A protein has these predicted regions:
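Hydrophobic or amphipathic alpha-helical targeting/insertion segments
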Residues: 112-169
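Predominantly five- to eight-bladed beta-propeller fold
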Residues: 21-28, 78-79, 161-215, 219-220, ...
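Active-site-proximal cap/loop segments of hydrolase catalytic domains
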Residues: 513-731
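Cap/lid segment of the alpha/beta-hydrolase catalytic domain
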Residues: 433-557, 563-564, 598
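Short glycine/acidic-enriched loop and turn motifs that connect beta-strands
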Residues: 69-73, 163-166, 253-256, 304-308, ...
Length: 731
């Protein structure tokens, strides 16, 4: 579905005259791409404006959000700010800066906004239809990546960095300023795409003096990171409504313990005394704390088991009181004990918590729970969209509630939307932004449907099918089977700028997206089955989906493509598919499980999913094996290649590299050299193996990219190589 044209006409007419007062040299604006044949291309994908981070004004009447635009020739994107009424009318662009603006936040009086630009915090007055002159209000030499204003905006918490555990040559000898090296004596020396030469820290400062001299480090002398790397931001901290307390999530571990443990605790920092009160410090990930409206309750997302990064995401609730002037935890309870899926992105509204979750329909929905754990789904089960957590909730007439959120589907990227509900029943939804309608209306639209297939063990597997525009079942089409990353994730109504299924369909391919074992929308048993069984049932699920597609009378050739765990799946299926697939594409995949164990950074993932399945345990000071087959160097390593656990033994024995003598199908291997999650040598090894077996193969390595391909021209090259390979072997 594409929304009606009315919103686009308002927006485009406005942008021609309702402009901010100044356009900086180097500004990147909306694309004016013209499409004559209705076919989406990789250039079209890069032309879309990308909406993010909507923020409602204090009076609830306006919404401020950012949009990123891309300039392929300049090889960069730039994010600027837009403002509209809460219903989407009177849209105007209020910044046209040459460098990106992020983390835009309203002042409590609604008359100005704060934001980050070039690593510092700025403030600008908002008057009428334009943004006034911005003024830098921070001076932090190490830069600021995120922040949160206190409720009264007299103070601010901000995120910056301090020197990390990894040393460089000048730490050894200041005269060695031309030497290049990284020096470490412990694990966790690199993370995601960077060497840990810096550690993020969170500070509190008065709004009038945002500088090191007037800032207080929340962690004091503790040697930990806050927020948690690599993706944590200010959402991991929350001011209490009275501004006296800050709740935060922190993994209070370093080195080997950090590398093997997922234990992130919840803490409360008292700003007056500088005292930290632990709320919950056991188990796995505890993240995203949010206070209720009067500061008497704190909710957060919690995983029960330490070492399992894909454990069920529960909603925990703590009752908070005051004793001797400090916050005290009275009780903690779970609100989702009877909910068999993951909860995400909590938002309070009165005595209810709204959240999002993947559902058995293969879509993401908005739900709510009361304080007794009674959960109801608010978005209609028949709506084939992914809805995200609300950014604003407003009581409406006749007892109804309007939920302002974001959504997308396979056919369009993120837009702002209002969902109206009454009690537990959905009433309607209305799209309130139309950022990309001028592009979408030029494109022919694919169609999608949900199907269910019977698996080899008699269960039902939900799959999405996406058909090219003007699909004609009397004709023959090439097809693509998507093998999912994660491995814990879901093929949903997802619109991605890296793996865009609509783009695949618009190149004339039928796209099959099976939700095999390990996906997250179908309950814990379905999700957890994959841990310790990488070579097993989920591979049979993929073969079931592939055989179904290949049997369709309108399907000719079939490709199999995937990234990360999907790349592992490609390498595995290459060795056992027979003649089902006509070509393969792997991006950032695991090829050699043993090599992966010794080179990845987040050891908890490999430890658990290779068959460890026991909680984190560590005894410092031990050297070598304990003799129990799972403990080495004092660390429980039941998923290691030298462990004796049956699942680990099987995983390494059946690693994709052990099946290369069966390889015979053309394969393309992508990898980024800055990928420290699945190091790029995995891609080199897979390509080398294909070459040694005489298999038609190609290798594309990106020296500056991580697990994802981000830079515009690299993205364009990736897509050109991707479709060139598909077309060569499937058309």
């Amino acid at each position: 579905m594409v929304a009606g044209l009315g919103g686009y006409l308002i927006a485009s007419a406005f942008l021609s005259f309702m402009t901010p007062s100044k356009t900086e040299k180097g500004y990147i604006g909306p694309s004016e791409i013209k499409i004559e044949d209705g076919v989406m291309t990789p250039e079209t994908l890069l032309a879309f404006g990308r909406i993010s981070d909507p923020q409602v004004s204090p009076d609830g009447q306006k919404v401020l959000y950012g949009v990123s635009y891309t300039d392929i020739a300049k090889n960069r994107s730039c994010r600027n700010l837009f403002l509209s009424n809460i219903d989407g009318t009177e849209l105007r662009q209020i910044t046209r800066y040459a460098s990106s603006v992020s983390c835009a936040r309203w002042a409590p009086d609604g008359k100005s906004i704060y934001f980050i630009q070039d690593g510092q915090i700025w403030k600008a007055p908002l008057g009428g239809k334009t943004l006034g002159a911005r003024r830098q209000i921070s001076n932090v030499p190490s830069g600021i990546s995120d922040f949160k204003l206190s409720p009264s905006a007299d103070r601010i918490l901000y995120i910056s960095t301090v020197p990390g555990p990894v040393k460089t040559p000048t730490d050894v000898d200041p005269a060695l300023d031309k030497a290049q090296a990284y020096i470490t004596e412990d694990l966790m020396y690199r993370h995601w795409d960077h060497w840990v030469t810096e550690t993020p820290r969170t500070y509190i400062a008065p709004i009038a003096h945002i500088d090191p001299e007037h800032s207080t480090d929340i962690l004091g002398s503790e040697p930990y990171e806050l927020p948690t790397e690599p993706f944590g931001g200010a959402e991991q901290l929350d001011w209490s409504p009275d501004g006296k307390l800050i709740a935060y999530s922190c993994r209070k571990r370093t080195g080997k313990e950090y590398a093997f443990s997922t234990n992130c605790g919840i803490y409360i920092y008292d700003t007056a005394s500088g005292t930290t009160i632990p709320v919950k410090t056991d188990g796995g990930y505890d993240t995203d704390p949010v206070w209720n409206e009067d500061g008497t309750r704190l909710a957060w997302i919690s995983m029960e088991r330490d070492g399992y990064e894909a454990d069920r995401q529960r909603i925990l609730l703590a009752d908070i009181s005051t004793l001797n002037g400090l916050p005290t935890v009275q009780s903690i309870k779970e609100l989702t004990a009877n909910f068999d899926n993951d909860a995400n992105s909590l938002v309070w509204h009165g005595d209810e918590i709204y959240f999002s979750s993947m559902r058995p329909t293969g879509t993401q929905a908005i739900l709510k729970t009361d304080m007794q754990g009674r959960i109801s789904q608010l978005t209609n089960k028949d709506w084939a969209y992914d809805f995200f957590s609300p950014w604003y909730i407003q009581n409406a007439e006749n007892g109804a509630v309007d939920i302002y959120t974001t959504y997308y589907c396979l056919n369009f990227p993120v837009e702002l939307v209002k969902v109206s509900v009454n009690g537990d029943a959905s009433l309607d939804f209305k799209q309130i932004s139309h950022e990309n309608e001028h592009i979408l209306k030029q494109l022919d639209t694919p169609t999608s449907e949900s199907i269910h297939l019977k698996t080899v063990d008699g269960q039902q597997m939900q799959c999405w099918m996406l058909y090219p525009p003007h699909f004609d079942p009397s004709k023959k089409y090439p097809a693509i089977e998507i093998v999912l990353g994660g491995p814990q994730g879901t093929n949903s109504q997802d619109f991605s700028y890296r793996w865009c299924y609509r783009l695949m369909a618009q190149q004339g391919y039928i796209v099959m997206m099976p939700n095999r074992r390990g996906t997250t929308a179908f309950g814990q048993e379905w999700k957890e089955q994959i841990s310790g069984d990488y070579p097993g049932l989920n591979m049979q699920d993929y073969l079931t989906a592939g055989r179904y597609v290949k049997s369709l009378p309108y399907v000719d050739k079939l490709a199999c493509v995937g990234a990360s765990y999907g790349g592992y799946s490609v390498y595995m299926l290459e060795g056992l598919h027979g003649d089902l697939y006509d070509c393969f594409i792997a991006h950032a995949g695991i090829f050699n499980e043993r090599q992966m164990w010794f080179t990845t950074e987040e050891m908890w993932f490999a430890n658990w999913d290779n068959g460890g399945l026991t909680q984190f345990a560590y005894t410092p000071g031990e050297v070598g094996p304990r003799g129990d087959g799972i403990t080495f160097g004092g660390m429980q390593q039941a998923g290691a290649p030298y462990a004796s656990t049956p699942k680990a033994v099987r995983h390494y024995a059946e690693s994709p590299d052990m099946k290369v003598t069966n390889w015979h199908t053309p394969i393309l291997c992508f990898h980024g050299m800055m990928d420290f999650r699945i190091p790029y040598e995995q891609g080199l090894a897979a390509f080398n193996a294909a070459q040694m077996m005489g298999v038609p193969s190609k290798l594309v390595i990106f020296p500056e990219e991580n697990h994802w391909i981000i830079r515009p021209q690299n993205s364009l090259l990736w897509h050109k190589e991707f479709y060139s390979w598909l077309d060569k072997w499937c058309k």
